[in-house]
A protein has these predicted regions:
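ER/Golgi luminal nucleotide-sugar-dependent glycosyltransferases, focusing on the catalytic module
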Residues: 1-274
Length: 274
């Protein structure tokens, strides 16, 4: 059994960014762990201004799948890499959200981009975990965004550092808990950070079997009450973990999301607006 499956998920943002490419290469080169790399990405990218109704949605762009795939394979030794057509999410959103007219505050079924940006990362996570389970045996799966920048001073053994507690503590491996960068309260609602997740074997099935539909259920529950969190995805993630009796353990690692025209050498924390 290998130590870690590193699973990239979601939209293929900044795939050709030199800083990010060097970061991931460096992490894999210096780790002492036995790591396989997997990826599940979408055929589109989009950027949004955070808002409760998504009225400020920025246009979606289709990527050159062949070039993106070649670029990724040139950068890292992916054991399996899938870039899937984003339209599959449109079908899932229609199936899971069409009965809930209140969810239009977030997902407008006439604007596919809104559904893809809301539910896409969870379907991508489910598929990525399935890829890892089908092609190897691992103690831990690290689910992570490609465009996540780690503090450059802490590149040394990043993968080792964020997984150590789960690998060294046999009790921890058997416990139902995941590692996350943060759990917090925003506008009175609890959220669990969804940029990076450390998933031990005890929790593999929760992320590989019904994750997309389960998160959809949590999102429908959010829109059944007047109070709504700013971060719908992260509040749905919190509800999903609580419903399945999965605890959280904080991962102590400074990181942030890469943005266009971003200078990664100028450190800012946090870089998101609430």
């Amino acid at each position: 059994m290998k130590d870690v499956a590193l699973v990239f998920y979601g939209q293929p943002r900044a795939i050709d960014n030199d800083f990010l490419r060097n970061q991931w290469k460096n992490m894999l080169d210096i780790t002492n762990l036995d790591v396989d790399v997997y990826g599940h990405f979408w055929s589109t990218t989009s950027n949004t201004n955070i808002s409760k109704t998504y009225e400020n949605f920025v246009k979606e762009q289709t990527v050159d799948v062949k070039n993106i795939k070649n670029s990724l394979l040139e950068c890292l030794p992916f054991k399996k890499l899938v870039i899937e057509d984003s339209s599959i999410i449109d079908e899932i959103c229609n199936r899971n959200f069409s009965h809930n007219r209140f969810i239009k505050r977030r997902v407008d079924l006439n604007n596919p981009s809104t559904g893809r940006a809301t539910l896409g990362q969870w379907y991508s996570t489910q598929k990525g975990v399935q890829l890892a389970n089908a092609n190897g045996e691992y103690k831990i799966i690290v689910r992570v965004r490609w465009d996540l920048i780690f503090n450059a001073e802490r590149w040394v053994k990043v993968i080792d550092n964020i997984t150590r507690d789960f690998l060294e503590d046999e009790y921890g491996i058997k416990m139902q808990h995941i590692g996350t960068l943060d759990v917090s309260i925003v506008e009175g609602q609890p959220i669990v950070n969804d940029w990076l997740t450390i998933i031990p074997r005890s929790c593999f099935e929760f992320f590989s079997e019904n994750l997309t539909d389960d998160i959809s259920t949590m999102m429908n529950s959010i829109f059944s009450v007047p109070e709504m969190p700013l971060s719908v995805q992260e509040n749905a993630f919190y509800r999903f973990l609580k419903m399945n009796h999965i605890d959280t353990k904080k991962v102590h690692m400074n990181c942030r999301i890469h943005r266009e025209n971003d200078d990664p050498t100028k450190w800012r924390w946090p870089n998101f607006s609430i």
